[in-house]
Amino acid sequence: MSYPQARIGVIGGSGLYQMADLADTVEVQFNTPFGPPSDALVIGTLAGERVAFLPRHGRGHRLLPAELPFQANIYAMKMLGVEYLLSASAVGSLREEYRPRDIVFPDQFFDRTKDRPSTFFGGGLVAHIGFDQPICTELAHLAAEAARGVELIGETRIHTGGTYVCMEGPAFSTLAESRLYRSWGMDIIGMTNLQEAKLAREAEICYATMALVTDYDCWHPDHGAVTVELIIDNLHKNAENAQRIVRAVVERLHAAAPPCASHSALKYALLTQPEDVPQATKQKLAAILAKYPAYRPEV
C-alpha cells in the first residue's frame, strides 16, 4: 500500500491535539508492523511543505505515557517519508529560570522509565546506534532560532540546552525525587520523549524536542505542587505560541533543511550479517532498512 508522503513530522503532546494551520489535509489510518499508532495521522500543507501530524496521546487524550505505541508512532512517520520530526511536549521545570509558559529546546535525556519498548531491533537483527547526542543539534538549533524570530504571546522565553529527565509516570514526582533530580543537574522533567528520540534515531529521522514548561514540578517553595489543572491551563495559554513556532520551523526547513548525521545513523550500526537475518525481520523493518540493499527482504 502506498501512503501520501511528508518530509516533516510533528508530534503533539498534552494540549496540542491538532494543527489548525494545515491545509489540504488527508487523514491516514495506519497498521504498522508494530501495531497502530496513537491515532490517525493528519497530513497537510504548511508553508509549502507536506507535514504529518500525530497527537501523541490520541485525540481525547486516551493513552497513558507508558501505554503509548512509541514504535508504531515513529514507524508510521518513517512510512510517510518523514526526515525531520519536531516533538512538542509538556514538561515541569527543575530550574528557577525556566518559568511556566517558557519553551525549552533540550539537548540531553536521562532515562528513569521502566521496560518501555525503545528499539525496533531484535528478532535476529542486532543494531547499536550512537546516542551520545540524543537530540539532533542542527534541528534543535534551527527550531530555537525560529522560535526567537516569532512574535510570542505573553512573557514566554526561549531556552536552549539542558537535560530532560524522562520519568515513568503517570503519577507526578515525589518531593524527594524532584529534589534529587535538581541535585543531579537535571533541567526539565517529562514522561514521553526519550523513547521517541531513540526510535527516531534508529529510523534515521532527525528529531528535536520543543518542551513547553507548565509548572515547577513540586520542588519550588513558592509554588504549589503540579496538578493536571495547572498543566492544562498553561498549555492552553501557550498553544498559540506553539503553533506559531511550528509554522516558523517548517518555513525554515522549507527554505534550507540542514544536513543531519541521524539520516545515516544505521550505516555502521547493523552488526548481524544480512544472510543471518530472518526474512520475517527484514520484512518487519522494511521501511527502516530500505536504503540498505543487503538487508531488504526477498521479493
Swiss-Prot record:
This is S-methyl-5'-thioadenosine phosphorylase. Belongs to the PNP/MTAP phosphorylase family. MTAP subfamily. The keyword Transferase applies. Keywords: Glycosyltransferase, Purine salvage, Transferase. InterPro entries: MTAP, Nucleoside_phosphorylase_d, Nucleoside_phosphorylase_sf, Purine_phosphorylase-2_CS. CDD domains: MTAP_SsMTAPII_like_MTIP (cd09010). Catalyzes the reversible phosphorylation of S-methyl-5'-thioadenosine (MTA) to adenine and 5-methylthioribose-1-phosphate. Involved in the breakdown of MTA, a major by-product of polyamine biosynthesis. Responsible for the first step in the methionine salvage pathway after MTA has been generated from S-adenosylmethionine. Has broad substrate specificity with 6-aminopurine nucleosides as preferred substrates. It comes from Gloeobacter violaceus (strain ATCC 29082 / PCC 7421). Pathway: Amino-acid biosynthesis; L-methionine biosynthesis via salvage pathway; S-methyl-5-thio-alpha-D-ribose 1-phosphate from S-methyl-5'-thioadenosine (phosphorylase route): step 1/1. One of its GO terms (biological process) is L-methionine salvage from methylthioadenosine. The record marks S173, V228 as: Important for substrate specificity. Its EC number is 2.4.2.28.
